[in-house]
Amino acid sequence: DHLQALVQDNAQLIRIARPYLMNLFQYLRETKHQITIVDAHGCILDTIFDDGTSQAPPIQYPISNGTIFSEEESGTNGISLCLSLEKPVMVFGPEHFQQRFHNSICYAAPIHDQFHHLIGCVDISGPLANYHPSALTMLESAINSIERELSFRQTNAVLTSALDAFTEG
């Protein structure tokens, strides 16, 4: 399955990002927002939301893992704009191309590896009526922590490999 392969290819990103995003989600829990981890091509890899006891989706439209939010697939949206600009963005209501998102707000911020290559983004989406003025700032802080941990782990893996090669040789 294509989605399983993408998730496996991005397993380290998901594993590192999820705890930071779960912490961030605690501040957004009552606002019916959801948080998605997205690869560099706009494919949703992982989603965090509170389904609680409600049968209704957390926001007005379903977003599931495997959904593609590239500019070509979905028009202007928080994910596609963030990935193309490689900058944090907010997309309000009718700024979305698709009318079904006109009652929504998206906050998205890119994730870069230690070499500053774009590897994906994180998107927070929810009802426009529940606009949260600090959401993008909190997201950027979480992304900063995720990037630092990714860099640390990547550097540690290289050093461990070099040390292993040195001790074996």
Model-identified regions with their sequence ranges:
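Flexible loop/coil segments at beta-strand boundaries within sensory signal-transduction domains
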Residues: H112-H117
